[in-house]
């Protein structure tokens, strides 16, 4: 059976930068408060860009980086919790714009774990079918579901998209996954939709609950436990010692979560790549944006061992061991 490798990456973030100082003018907060509690200095917020646009731009970059044509793609999966439409799917919209006429396309929703879930689904589909190449995108326009009056959440999130292209290869690539869900704790991180149809609504605007709401303490506890356990599980499957792993690329939610996870694993936080200071939490986009940034900076060499790991609403979690092949 063929191996599956990452052969290209891409990303897109809006040009519009929102600093901590700006947020201190609209909610009761400060740069010092945000920085010391989250590690975030700024985030990118879309002006004209929507989820589809950002997904398309990241896809174009990944295709170019992989040195393939769009019609070489057999599968497109977009992980997003902020689609522009219920239908057509974001993946189908990407297919149309890039000209990937041969691809099977669909979206998935697993919040911040979405990109990991997408990789696992794609690997399974490539290994068990005639398909050879897949485009996996994490794309989010979180600014449209953030309550900009809630200082506990509005300081955390940003917009952006990241992509990776997978291909069947002879060389070692994506090795082992570990993923799961805990719906029993789902109420700790929510974003509602309209609760009723509007056929009998007498008001101009339906009351809804369509902003991100989070129990920060519970999510922190879950995140540290889920990420450390996932990494340990992947170590067991691969027989890797953490000293062999060049980087751990985790979901970019909060620097404290990463620091506590490193401490629990008895390893240095420097093993964890972080760019959340520039982009904040971009949900499903955070891991592929970081991966593309590392690829562009030349931080990864062939045969480097890396682990991607994330957690998110649902609650969900997942990780994957990869031998880098670009």
From Swiss-Prot:
Purpose: Catalyzes the condensation reaction of fatty acid synthesis by the addition to an acyl acceptor of two carbons from malonyl-ACP. Catalyzes the first condensation reaction which initiates fatty acid synthesis and may therefore play a role in governing the total rate of fatty acid production. Possesses both acetoacetyl-ACP synthase and acetyl transacylase activities. Its substrate specificity determines the biosynthesis of branched-chain and/or straight-chain of fatty acids.
Description of how the protein assembles with itself and partners: Homodimer.
Family matches, as CDD domains: KAS_III
GO cellular component: cytoplasm
EC supergroup of this enzyme: transferase
Name by which UniProt lists this protein: Beta-ketoacyl-[acyl-carrier-protein] synthase III
Region ACP-binding: start-end pairs: 252-256
E.C. designation(s): 2.3.1.180
Principal subcellular localisation of the protein: cytoplasm
Domain topic, free-text comment: The last Arg residue of the ACP-binding site is essential for the weak association between ACP/AcpP and FabH.
Positions of the catalytic residues: 112, 251, 281
Family: Belongs to the thiolase-like superfamily. FabH family.
One function term, GO molecular function aspect: 3-oxoacyl-[acyl-carrier-protein] synthase activity
A Pfam family reported for this protein in Swiss-Prot or TrEMBL: ACP_syn_III_C
């Amino acid at each position: 059976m063929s191996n599956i490798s990452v052969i290209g990456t891409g990303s897109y973030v809006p040009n519009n930068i929102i600093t901590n100082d700006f947020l201190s003018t609209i909610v009761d907060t400060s740069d010092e408060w945000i920085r010391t509690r989250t590690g975030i200095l700024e985030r990118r917020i879309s002006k004209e860009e929507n989820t589809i646009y950002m997904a398309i731009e990241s896809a174009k970059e990944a295709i170019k980086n992989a040195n393939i044509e769009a019609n070489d793609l057999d599968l497109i999966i977009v992980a997003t919790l902020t689609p522009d439409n219920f239908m057509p799917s974001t993946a189908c919209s990407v297919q149309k714009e890039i000209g990937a006429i041969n691809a099977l396309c669909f979206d998935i929703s697993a919040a911040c774990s979405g990109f990991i879930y997408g990789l696992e689904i794609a690997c399974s589909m490539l290994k068990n079918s005639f398909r050879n190449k897949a485009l996996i995108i994490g794309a989010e326009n979180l600014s449209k579901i953030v309550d900009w009056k809630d200082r506990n959440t509005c300081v955390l999130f940003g917009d952006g998209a990241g992509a990776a292209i997978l291909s069947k290869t002879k060389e070692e690539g994506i090795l082992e996954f570990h993923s799961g869900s805990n719906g029993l704790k789902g109420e700790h991180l929510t974003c509602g939709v309209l609760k009723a149809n509007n056929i009998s609504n007498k008001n101009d605007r339906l009351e809804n609950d369509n902003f991100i709401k989070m129990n920060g303490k519970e999510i922190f506890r879950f995140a540290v436990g889920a990420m450390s356990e996932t990494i340990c599980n992947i170590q067991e499957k691969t027989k890797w010692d953490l000293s062999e792993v060049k980087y751990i690329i985790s979901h970019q939610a909060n620097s404290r979560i990463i620091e506590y996870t490193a401490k629990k694993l008895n390893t240095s936080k420097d093993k964890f790549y972080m760019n959340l200071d520039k982009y904040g939490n971009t949900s499903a986009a955070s891991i592929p944006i970081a991966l593309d940034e590392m690829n562009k900076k030349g931080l990864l060499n062939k045969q480097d061992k890396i682990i991607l790991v994330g957690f998110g609403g649902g609650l969900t979690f997942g990780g994957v061991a990869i031998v880098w092949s670009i």
